[in-house]
Curated annotation (Swiss-Prot):
Record's compositionally biased regions (Basic and acidic residues): 793-804
GO molecular function, one term: iron-sulfur cluster binding
Binding site for ATP: S50, P51, T52, G53, T54, G55, K56, S57
Cofactor needs: [4Fe-4S] cluster
Species, as recorded: Sclerotinia sclerotiorum (strain ATCC 18683 / 1980 / Ss-1)
SUPFAM superfamilies on file: P-loop containing nucleoside triphosphate hydrolases
Entry annotated with the keyword Ion transport: no
PANTHER family per the UniProt record, alphabetical: ATP-DEPENDENT DNA HELICASE DDX11-RELATED, DNA REPAIR DEAD HELICASE RAD3/XP-D SUBFAMILY MEMBER
Name of the molecule in the record: ATP-dependent DNA helicase CHL1
Enzyme Commission number: 5.6.2.3
Region (Disordered): 128-162, 775-804
Enzyme class label: isomerase
Family stated for the protein in its record: Belongs to the DEAD box helicase family. DEAH subfamily. DDX11/CHL1 sub-subfamily.
Length: 902
């Protein structure tokens, strides 16, 4: 159900339900919360869009938690009646039994709340005490000192001569492959700053207790009534890298190494004195309970969980599992949610529960990132060198299958290297990899990849080899530079773990993903091994999301820029009928007078803008762009942000802008109407109006933004050149003076001529053909009579009908591939534009510089509030249709009007 439709079925009926919003909600927030409630109540899929700055995350929390408490209240009433429906006992006995059961359930609930309340009170008093004496430690009182872990030096942590620690344990198993072995990435980025602040604010408000309020007639005072509301029980989960408190484990330089070392310390073969002392066991169960109660008592972030584990001296990674069941909200990063194996490791079951994914506009990219991997020729050479050195050192001491499997790993790496070196000599810059050809060298095609992968995962070969490599490097460094006390930085790239992920990718069905080779462009006459890479790209995220879809009661995908919606329904939910999917696109909370939006199809001299790949070297268009920027920077106060489709295109523009003008017909002369700018570059003329800042791959975002904001704060204004999909296009707020105008130059389509995009679009097309063929076949079967015969008259037209059907299917499939390609582009545009207006009082102009933005298909894929602004401006004669002069006049009046109000 599309809630943006004007049809009665698409309307949301606002029942003025109390969603316990901490402020007075806007109408769109009420609509959003009601939609969230309805989706959860009806067990549907919700794809919801509300622009950034409209209180989306807060509305998500209020709507979902109101539903949760209502659901639990109904569940409580159901439990009370359970077992009494068909009872033959007298009614008074049944009622008495219900009362006893009710008191028992309520008593348990109240006892838990009292326990958590006492913890909250103690922590509050401790915070007051610590702030009163000037101590900056606000996480609690004096922490219990965490004792030594009783563990010897970790592998790779010593320069000693004993090398037995690097030997592999005997390998005997040749059974079936076990475990997922999937690469876990992205654990470092848990929550955004805004999300953490929002989570903290939740702790300040309460929601009604799930217990029926009529069961407390004696509680009439304000304090008693307040007790009828419960604090939220929230639990943040993270990876071992985020939560490990064993200093000899968490100092390791990769997630995989930490995971493997943690598992190793728990093995029965590990001596007791070397086991991790923080691991939960039968002797420290009370500490686990204490951790659980403290974790649930207040709203905590992931750092708080680690600090709590240190204070109690219990592993927060494992102890947090005890708090999952009593928690009402569990927050966790993408990799822990999206990987079934990770959920199972944490003890998380989604059966019957609700899954809400905020900022879901990059969900499909996140899934692809988790299951994708790449490895360069240089990395493969390094892997071969590491494996070779290890094999030479320990060959005589490796037993049985260890020796065989290490040799097999070297042969496979040799084959991969041979393939890439052959491709390096060819003329193709990229292409699809034929797996048979990839493993044709060194007899690698005779190796059982499944067994080899299982061996690499379970034998810990990767960590042993990398630790030995580091060990030998340290010894060499110590012997060659004895007086140098500087520590050599550790490699942050676990090469052999990457190799394992790449081999695992080779076992994926070709219907799910594809392996490519990619050459980087270089002007060097001699190609470098760095410049060619093997890359596995996931094409179909649906199978990896299916375990969530099939288990959860309801799923909500929410974001500020979810439009266009069609990708989510066709790719993530291909088997879900349309009536089970609800979509909602909210408008903005700002008044219409706070937005000026328009396409800019041509500049002041009438040169049209059509920034296709073929036209991006057009110097006339570049000069016309310079004239537009000079006009805009003259009219718009404070900060102006300009987004370009790529870093290469931005470099081309800046190079053109750095060429001195010749006067007549130049960008400067035409823009000013005089010869004043003769001899100056466009960049020089622009810098006279506003200081110029540029996004770069090398410089940090913080440095650029700080200088940009400082210039605006000093009243100089600023012009910032950025890149769509770059560092500044997502997660950065250009609110208020930081973004009084956002300009998008061109349409940021990906390069459809690359092997990766050709294959991706072909996959979309093939999937659509398969789905549509199945649909028509089912429809055809419905036209047959009970004996399986076609109805009279149909047989003669069958051949012609099937041909028309095939043509229709192919045409529709090509249309879906085209839609997907356009959607990727327009979602990026919407994301960039959404950086500007961040709250109700904010205002900004939005200019879309390309004549293709006037096309119906493109306009239809803009976020609703942007599209309305563009169409409204056109209707009032202030848009691009009235000519460039009229457009600039409208923009000038808009800016002056807003500044006068302020």
């Amino acid at each position: 159900m599309d809630l943006t439709d004007d049809s009665p079925d698409g309307e949301v009926k606002i029942h003025k339900k109390d969603f316990h919003h901490p402020y007075t909600p806007y109408p769109i927030q009420e609509k959003f919360m009601q939609t969230v409630y309805d989706v959860l109540e009806q067990g549907k899929i919700g794809i919801l869009e509300s622009p950034t700055g409209t209180g989306k995350s807060l509305s998500l929390i209020c709507g979902s938690l109101t539903w949760l408490r209502d659901f639990k209240r109904k569940e409580f009433e159901g439990i009370l009646n359970d077992g009494f429906e068909n009872s033959e006992e007298p009614e008074w006995m049944i009622e008495a039994a219900k009362v006893r059961k009710k008191r028992e359930l309520i008593g348990r609930r109240e006892e838990m709340e009292r326990k958590l309340g006492r913890i909250r009170e103690r922590e509050r008093c401790e915070r007051d005490r610590m702030s009163g004496n000037g101590n900056g430690n606000m996480r609690g009182g004096k922490r219990r000192k965490v004792g030594g872990d009783g563990e010897g030096d970790l592998v790779g942590g010593s320069n000693g001569s004993n090398e037995d620690e690097f030997l592999l344990e005997d390998w005997e198993s040749d059974g079936e492959i076990g475990g997922s072995g999937k690469k876990k990435t992205g654990d470092e980025a848990i929550f955004s700053k805004e999300t953490l602040e929002l989570k903290k604010s939740i702790g300040m408000w309460k929601f009604p207790s799930p217990m029926p309020l009529e069961e407390f007639p004696s509680k009439t005072t304000e304090k008693d009534k307040d007790n009828l509301h419960e604090h939220l029980r929230h639990l943040p989960l993270g990876s071992r890298k985020n939560l490990c408190i064993n200093p000899k484990v968490n100092k390791l330089n990769s997630v995989t190494a930490i995971n493997e070392r943690c598992a190793e310390l728990q093995q029965s073969s590990t001596p007791k004195e070397h086991k991790c002392p923080h691991l939960p066991n039968k002797d420290n169960k009370p500490l686990v309970s204490t951790f659980r109660d403290h974790a649930l008592a207040t709203i905590r972030d992931i750092e708080d969980m680690g600090a709590l584990g240190k204070e109690i001296s219990i592993c927060p990674y494992y102890a947090s599992r005890s708090a999952i069941k009593p928690a009402e909200i569990v927050t966790l990063p993408y990799p822990l949610l999206l990987q079934k194996s990770a959920r199972e490791a944490l003890g998380i079951s989604l059966k019957g529960h609700v899954v809400i994914i905020d900022e879901a506009h990059n969900l499909m990219d996140a899934i692809a990132g988790i299951y994708g991997t790449e490895m360069s020729l240089k990395e493969l050479k390094l892997a071969k060198e590491m494996l070779g050195n290890y094999f030479m050192k320990f060959a005589k001491r490796l037993k049985g299958k260890n020796r065989i499997y290490v040799a097999q790993a070297i042969r496979v790496v040799d084959s991969l290297m041979g393939y890439l070196m052959k491709r390096l000599e060819g003329t193709e810059i990229d292409g699809v990899v034929d797996q048979k050809e990839l493993l044709a060298g060194k007899g690698a095609d005779q190796i059982d990849l499944f067994k080899l992968i299982r061996y690499l995962q379970e034998s810990k070969l990767a960590r042993k080899v990398e630790s030995y490599t580091e060990h030998t490097r340290n010894i060499k460094q110590a012997s060659t530079i004895p007086h140098n006390n500087k520590e050599t930085p550790k490699s942050t790239t676990p090469i052999l773990h990457t190799l394992t992920s790449l081999l695992l990718a080779l076992t994926h069905p070709t219907t799910e993903g594809q392996l490519f080779f990619l050459k980087s462009t270089s002007t060097s006459p001699s190609p470098s091994p760095d410049l060619i890479t093997l890359k596995f790209q996931l094409l179909n995220p649906a199978p990896h999301f299916e375990s969530i879809v099939s288990s959860a009661r309801a799923i909500i995908l929410a974001g500020g820029t979810m439009s266009p919606f069609s990708d989510y329904t066709s790719i993530l939910f291909p088997s879900i009928p349309s009536h089970k999917i609800t979509t909602l696109s909210c408008g903005h909370v700002i008044p219409k007078t706070h937005l000026f939006a328009s396409t800019v199809s041509r500049g002041p001299t009438g040169i049209p803008f059509k920034w296709t790949f073929a036209n991006r070297g057009n110097t006339d268009m570049m000069d016309e762009l310079g004239r537009v920027l000079l006009n805009v920077c003259t009219i718009v106060p404070d900060g102006v942000v300009v987004f370009f489709p790529s870093y290469n295109f931005l470099s081309t523009i800046l190079y053109r802008f750095s060429i001195p003008s010749s006067g007549t017909g130049s960008a400067t002369a035409t823009a000013t109407g005089t010869e004043k700018g003769k001899g100056k570059t466009i960049l020089e003329r622009l810098s006279e109006k506003k200081p110029i800042f540029q996004e770069s791959k090398e410089e940090s975002v913080e440095t650029i933004l700080a200088a940009y904001a400082k210039s605006i704060a000093e009243g100089k204004g600023a012009l910032l050149f950025s890149v769509v999909g770059g560092k500044l296009s997502e997660g950065i707020n250009f609110s208020d003076a930081l973004g009084r105008c956002v300009m998008i130059v061109g349409l940021p389509f990906p390069n459809m001529h690359t092997a990766e995009w050709k294959r991706r679009l072909r996959f979309i097309e093939e999937s659509a053909v398969e789905r549509l063929t199945s649909f028509y076949q089912e429809k055809e079967s419905n036209n047959k009579d009970g004996n399986g015969n076609e109805e009279e008259g149909n047989g003669k037209k069958k051949e012609n009908r099937e041909k028309i059907q095939r043509d229709q299917i192919l045409q529709q499939a090509k249309g879906e591939a085209r839609d997907y390609f356009e959607n990727v582009c327009m979602r990026a545009v919407n994301q960039c534009v959404g950086r500007a207006i961040r709250h109700r009082g904010d205002w900004a102009g939005i200019l879309l510089l390309d004549e293709r933005y006037k096309g119906e298909r493109v306009v239809g894929k803009l976020a609703g509030w942007i599209r309305e602004g563009v169409l409204r401006g056109e209707g009032m004669g202030m848009g691009d249709a009235g000519g460039f002069g009229r457009l600039m006049g409208g923009l000038g009046r808009f800016c002056r009007g807003r500044r006068e109000v302020l």
